């Protein structure tokens, strides 16, 4: 079989046929969808380095200490709340149309802080940015599921996590560099989607699926909510674990006496690399079932968190970050593939939106829960230790409760 991306990786389901004129997806479509998938990362991390400057700029605003962090976190919460609705619209109307509109609006509201004069108006623009990110993430992931099937779909969903992990490191560096020119400067990067809109309009298409002898469905096929319950519940907790050390590692390092920003950045980059390696490994392991992979992934993450808790020595903390990064990098595509592989074309947008929403709610809850645990156990490192123990319990729970008869992750139904 040729290694070029193709829609023909596995047989189509019985009773369905593809249009004779339907196009075949290839590298251009993959590059566009993976690049657009990074926009939610851009929204999440780009302005983190300039938050102190924003706080200083709006120091006279009432509640500035609460409002400035919301500028960073608002998009994640909004994605969590609106992604299922974005999936509904994508299924009901048209994936491509929703994606292109969201890309244009993303650029408009993303760059709005360049000229907005109040903290409240900036937060409103960030809320609207989150709505756009929800639509973009849901449509891109859904289209990857539409265009490819079988092992190749698993490979590209893992690649989506890998690219997002690498882009987070790049965007943090860009945000810091642009921030030297003022706190508004990083917001110029939100024009990037406009560079993708024209290629997307030409190269991305709305797939169509026909049942033999029938017209296209006008009514939405019901989503198997019970089937999605287990993947989404595990994803909610997985999102908390995934973002815990990603957000808190720099605070841990500062707490053990590290003052060099280069050292903090270097260890954070090592963890990001481990996450990328974990995501890249998924393609080789997708022949296994969730019941096999989830205990390993949660187990590695738990080991890393406990190591970070157990020592103030940098080599031990770094090793813990590597274990957790690798485990969560492998975890994310496992959870995504587990959720979407069992969905039919007509259900995929809503199912993907629900999964995306639960992941980002987990991301939003992660620092809040760790702050609450920290207050109860006397510090951030002990809180990470508690999360490590809970994650170890999750590893055992998935081994015992996830169904034995789950399909391999490289087997698709549509």
Question: What is each of the regions a protein language model found here?
Answer:
Residues 97-111, 292-307:
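Structural signature of the two symmetry-related core transmembrane helices
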